[in-house]
């Protein structure tokens, strides 16, 4: 991943935190979605995940890029609503690095 991607996620996270803190549902999609509750945020995340899968299976790369962007955006909202950060996700991925996927999954079971 490029440094630019980390900077992009950092900017996105900051904007989402600002919009959540402002709580202006009439002026902000992020705030309006959050006002509907965690369940609605999770539902929207699921919808975006399905759309990303459909784009991938149909081999439509531009659509997949768009849907993956929507997926990351909505995941960012859900993480922020829960008080979690991309740094926490990065730390977990770093912790798992070098561990076999089968081994890591078995450790969680």
Curated annotation (Swiss-Prot):
Keywords, alphabetical: Amino-acid biosynthesis, ATP-binding, Cytoplasm, Histidine biosynthesis, Hydrolase, Nucleotide-binding
GO terms, biological process: L-histidine biosynthetic process
Database matches in Gene3D superfamilies: MazG-like (1.10.287.1080)
InterPro entries: HisE, PRib-ATP_PPHydrolase-like
One cellular component (GO) term of this entry: cytoplasm
Reactions accelerated catalytically: 1-(5-phospho-beta-D-ribosyl)-ATP + H2O = 1-(5-phospho-beta-D-ribosyl)-5'-AMP + diphosphate + H(+)
NCBIfam families associated with the record: histidine_hisI, PRK00400.1-3
Family of this protein: Belongs to the PRA-PH family.
Protein name per UniProt: Phosphoribosyl-ATP pyrophosphatase
């Amino acid at each position: 991943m490029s440094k630019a991607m980390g900077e992009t996620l950092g900017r996105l996270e900051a904007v989402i935190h600002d919009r959540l803190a402002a709580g202006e549902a009439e002026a902000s999609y992020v705030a309006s979605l959050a006002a509907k509750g965690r369940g609605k945020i999770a539902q929207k995340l699921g919808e975006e995940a399905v759309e990303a899968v459909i784009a991938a299976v149909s081999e439509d790369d531009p659509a997949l890029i768009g849907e993956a962007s929507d997926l990351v955006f909505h995941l960012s909202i859900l993480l922020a609503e829960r008080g979690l950060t991309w740094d926490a996700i990065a730390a977990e991925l770093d912790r798992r690095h070098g561990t076999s996927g089968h081994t890591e999954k078995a450790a969680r079971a």
